[in-house]
Amino acid sequence: DEVSEVVQEAANKVIVFVPFKHAIDIVADRLRKDGFSTEIVSGAVSMKARTKIFKDFQESDDPRVLVIQPQSASHGVTLTAADTIVWFAPIASVETWLQANERINRPSQKNKMTIIKIYGSEVEKRVYDALESKEANQKTLVSLYEQELKA
């Protein structure tokens, strides 16, 4: 229900990252039941099909929502038709977290971006907090290297 509420309130397209294979179909089916055109991108989807889904998402009205397994689209994909990301559950990899969130943060993005984290327990909230802390540390580290290179 929370995911559908976010999609309903979003002005533009939405990406929902679902880390667990068994939950991807459940989330997509619920969104479809609630009337949202939805496509799935996971490891089970061929590269040719992914390319078509991404192209349609960027260039057409439908699909409105992509339900994505984060590892399947965390690198090399521009999805700026969306300005909202929903994390259905946290992941362990800070690199995948950063890269997945960057799918909507491109020079062609014209809208304010929103990242929403859904959690069902205090442990999941702490995992999100840890990801954000690692993200801040990684950005600080990169900044230090950049300063050193300029010196």
Predicted regions and their residues:
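Alpha-helical elements of the RecA-like P-loop NTPase motor core of helicases
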Residues: 25, 29, 51, 77, ...
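Conserved interdomain hinge at the start of the Helicase C-terminal
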Residues: 1-19
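Short, solvent-exposed loop/turn segments at secondary-structure junctions
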Residues: 20-24, 45-46, 72-73, 91-93, ...
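Conserved helicase ATPase core of P-loop NTP-dependent helicases/translocases
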Residues: 15-17, 25, 32-73
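Short, well-ordered beta-strand core segments
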Residues: 66, 85-86, 104
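A short beta-strand element within the Helicase C-terminal
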Residues: 77-90, 113-117
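Conserved catalytic network of the ASCE P-loop NTPase/AAA+ motor domain
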Residues: 7-9, 56-60, 77-79
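A conserved SF2-helicase RecA2
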Residues: 92-151
